[in-house]
A protein has these predicted regions:
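Short intrinsically disordered, low-complexity coil segments enriched in acidic
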Residues: 1-7, 12, 155, 168-172
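Mid-to-C-terminal secondary-structure elements
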Residues: 3-5, 9-25, 29, 34-136
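Peri-transmembrane interface segments
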Residues: 110, 118-119, 123-126, 137-172
Length: 173
């Protein structure tokens, strides 16, 4: 299974990714729903070996897409997940490829903010847009908004529980 990620030009900056070759998805790629893609290093090697993939085509759901870039490797997460095993497409192209051309099927939205105030305003704006787009009222949300801060707190909470559990097990032994 290869992760297809629909995105826009801001994705690279938000995730601190840089191209090792080629370019990244542009606003025009998004606007025109062009059939281009950017590969993680794992998929670049999987499809093309040591060969330069820029300008070559791969088929996604039988439709040819031109490789315009390859991103620098991120390696494995602490949990062992390969962070380079993906294909990035303009989100408009992915929606046309897999779903309807409207944005009702977007699964994940990533963003960054310069301050906590901007982050709160952005979260509020996203919630408002999602409710309007999905025609739902407050309390009927069928989506979730998470921040890295929230995820970090959950991880730290889980780590604390595991530490307590491991301490208890060690005490019993």
């Amino acid at each position: 299974i290869i992760a297809l990620v629909g995105t826009n030009p801001d994705f690279a900056g938000i995730n601190d990714w840089k191209n090792i070759s080629g370019s990244f998805i542009t606003e025009n790629d998004v606007k025109d729903a062009t059939k281009v893609c950017v590969l993680g290093l794992t998929n670049s090697r999987r499809f093309f070996g040591a060969e330069d993939p820029i300008g070559k085509k791969i088929r996604i759901n039988g439709i040819p897409h031109v490789v315009i870039g390859v991103l620098e490797p991120k390696g494995l997460t602490p949990g062992g997940r390969d962070q380079d095993d993906f294909i990035l497409l303009p989100y408009t192209s992915l929606n046309r490829l897999l779903f309807r051309p409207d944005m009702s099927n977007i699964v994940t939205v990533l963003m960054s903010a310069r301050s906590s105030e901007e982050l709160e305003y952005a979260k509020f704006s996203i919630i408002k847009i999602l409710r309007e787009t999905r025609n739902i009222n407050p309390g009927e949300d069928n989506f979730d908004i998470s921040s890295y801060e929230g995820v970090t707190k959950k991880i730290l909470g889980t780590t604390k529980i595991l530490r307590i559990l491991l301490t208890s097990i060690a005490s019993i032994s």
